[in-house]
Amino acid sequence: MEKFELHILGCGSALPTTRHFATSQVVNLRDKLFMIDCGEGAQMQLRKSRLKFSRLNHIFISHLHGDHCFGLMGLISTFGLLGRTAELHIHSPKGLEELLTPMLNFFCHTLAYKVIFHEFDTRQTSVVYEDRSMTVTTIPLQHRIPCCGFLFAEKARPNHIIRDMVDFYKVPVYELNRIKNGSDYVTPEGEVIANTRLTRPSDPPRKYAYCSDTIFRPEIVEQLSGVDLLFHEATFAESELARAKETYHTTAAQAARIALEAGVRQLVIGHFSARYEDESILLKEASAVFPNTILAKENLCISL
């Protein structure tokens, strides 16, 4: 299968700790890199991950709280020091361009590349990025400020040609694309060769969903249905349910309920409150609801 990986750069929340970096992730789809959130220290973690800076062209910011975007200026500046010339696209809720432009003009006025901002409405689902391989769609969340998650959906690939059968029936090269896309082949004698004899199915397309920060929000279950991997914030244990509601965050058990109801394959929980020196309590509570749960941790790489 083609590469589809999630790299956890940081999984902490607002208050810094010595255990975790602030929230940031990188999706690697066929060696194209897409960053999700860019907390403080993200570029250091990107270095540790051994991912190539030059392959990162799109950054998706969920909301404008500092623990999700304070790393942007440092990363943008470093790209300049590395001699970057390719455009950098930053997708975010309204307001980020207004905040960063004065700092870019002051600290990074000699950049040899363009930083292009794309704003989206967090209140509705919309496609914010698309290429031949993938779409990125927003997931409306509910936090103290406008916030959304992101659904990375691989596009279905054409069927694979069975070379021996194509050679046996002497299929012309110009017919191969049609056959890959599901057409039968008709021989010069008029015999219909079923597509199933000439091809085998491609691997099913994969999906990754990122949901942070949000209060418990069952409305997102339908959009998350059947995803291969779900990252959902789990800031608090169930004993802090009132605090979770007050701050518009989620407990580990609530994150697991979302995963269970959506029928996802695997759940990763993160965005841990600094109060937990040992997050095993969060894993225990989530696993009791959805057994296939793991804890996020720095430098973790998950293959879909």
Curated annotation (Swiss-Prot):
EC number: 3.1.26.11
Free-text comment on the cofactor: Binds 2 Zn(2+) ions.
Binding site for Zn(2+) 1: 63, 65, 143, 213
Annotated binding of Zn(2+) 2, by residue: 67-68, 213, 271
Coiled-coil positions: none
Cited InterPro entries: Metallo-B-lactamas, RibonucZ/Hydroxyglut_hydro, RNase_Z/BN
Record keywords, A-Z: Endonuclease, Hydrolase, Metal-binding, Nuclease, tRNA processing, Zinc
Active site per database record: 67
Pfam families: Lactamase_B_2
Reactions mediated catalytically: Endonucleolytic cleavage of RNA, removing extra 3' nucleotides from tRNA precursor, generating 3' termini of tRNAs. A 3'-hydroxy group is left at the tRNA terminus and a 5'-phosphoryl group is left at the trailer molecule
SUPFAM superfamilies given in the database record: Metallo-hydrolase/oxidoreductase
Family, similarity comment: Belongs to the RNase Z family.
Function in brief: Zinc phosphodiesterase, which displays some tRNA 3'-processing endonuclease activity. Probably involved in tRNA maturation, by removing a 3'-trailer from precursor tRNA.
SUBUNIT field: Homodimer.
Protein name stated in the entry: Ribonuclease Z
Organism: Bacteroides fragilis (strain YCH46)
Gene transcribed to yield this protein: rnz
